[in-house]
Amino acid sequence: MALRVAGLFLKKELVAPATQQLRLLRTGNTTRSQFLANSPNTALDKSILQRYRNLETPANRVQATYLWIDGTGENIRLKDRVLDKVPSSVEDLPDWQYDGSSTYQAHGENSDTTLKPRAIYRDPFKPGKNDVIVLCDTYSADGKPTASNKRAAFQAAIDLISDQEPWFGIEQEYTLLDVDGRPFGWPENGFPAPQGPYYCGVGADRVYARDLVEAHVVACLYAGIDFAGTNAEVMPAQWEFQIGPAGIKACDDLWVSRYILQRIAEEYGVVVTFDPKPMEGQWNGAGAHTNFSTKEMRADGGIKAIEEAIEKLSKRHERHIKAYDPKEGKDNERRLVGRLETSSIDKFSWGVANRAVSVRVPRGVATAGKGYLEDRRPSSNCDPYAVCNAIVRTCLLNE
């Protein structure tokens, strides 16, 4: 469940008048050490594990971490197995079962749920050079996709329009918290200076946890993810990374990059939340802006196809809002409020270089007359399969 405790805890303070918020960031010398001391994970001596990772293991024995999306539609689960050969593709990987009654996906009397491997990545956490991360989708006892398996429907849509070469680039925003739910680096008995100096910022008073962010970049590149970049965001302790452009691989990559981020954060004793509005008041929310294009849009004169797609999106606004967060719009109600660089959840809008609209056309695209559109409505905790499936079915399949 997405963390909102920080927002609830500080709601009264953070809606105070701006004049009361103009105070210097106060961080005690012991804040970070106390912060980490409160995390059970950082209490463990990491050097002990390294002793065992230095042991030689049989070359033909491979550790495979199977990942899947649980019944919440936003959280990742995993379990490990050892394989007897090095897999070269997902076809070499066996299906597996797990207890779906413990992941909100089945009832106890018929709880065996099936994992089907769909994508394979190098594992930055395991010691073996052949160890892998296996992204799976999930199927109930009757063989049908579980309710949280949005990948199956998206794959079916992609199969129908693959000749149009759809690309997706996803901008994943997230917020770092301490284990008590307070944003990382925020003073214990107050709050930072108002937004302004933090976006793409530099300096110890403006940027927090850059080490964690840079570790995430390297781990994702090692894994084979199409990682495009990263930056500090508008709210302190908020960051963004970008995935793509690609087809369904962009969605696979986003889920695996979320997993890698959370695993690295475990080691730092930091909590990652993808909640779209973790802090109440005059603080930016978090989204997953989704950039979309087709072969026609990227060609000369593609702006016409872009505008046609926007027109189709304008007619299916309600459908997209329901698809753009795991609670069918309830999470985005807190974020899409018509201010703080968001549009209104109740009304579709678009414009060139405008960040207060539902769909933005970047100025460079408008100038070039070709490129892509940016759908700014998806929440940071969205399922990218659901988002991209809705876009494809509206814009390309005319559903």
UniProtKB/Swiss-Prot annotation:
EC number in record: 6.3.1.2
Annotated organism of origin: Drosophila melanogaster (Fruit fly)
Location in or out of the cell: Mitochondrion
Domain GS beta-grasp: 62-143
First-level EC class: ligase
Name of the protein in its database record: Glutamine synthetase 1, mitochondrial
Oligomeric and partner information: Homooctamer.
Family according to the record: Belongs to the glutamine synthetase family.
Keyword Mitochondrion: yes
The GS catalytic domain, residue ranges: 150-399
Reaction(s) catalysed (UniProt annotation): L-glutamate + NH4(+) + ATP = L-glutamine + ADP + phosphate + H(+)
Domain of life assignment: Eukaryota
GO CC, alphabetical: cytoplasm; mitochondrion
InterPro entries, A to Z: Gln_synt_N, Gln_synt_N_sf, Gln_synth/guanido_kin_cat_dom, Gln_synth_cat_dom, Gln_synth_gly_rich_site, Gln_synth_N_conserv_site, Glutamine_Synthetase
Any GO molecular function: ATP binding
Keyword Transmembrane recorded: no
Keywords: ATP-binding, Ligase, Mitochondrion, Nucleotide-binding, Transit peptide
PROSITE patterns cross-referenced by the UniProt entry: GLNA_1 (PS00180), GLNA_ATP (PS00181), GS_BETA_GRASP (PS51986), GS_CATALYTIC (PS51987)
PANTHER family per record: GLUTAMINE SYNTHETASE (PTHR20852), GLUTAMINE SYNTHETASE 1, MITOCHONDRIAL (PTHR20852:SF44)
First and last residues of the transit peptide: 1-27
A Gene Ontology BP annotation from the UniProt entry: L-glutamine biosynthetic process
Pfam family, one: Gln-synt_C
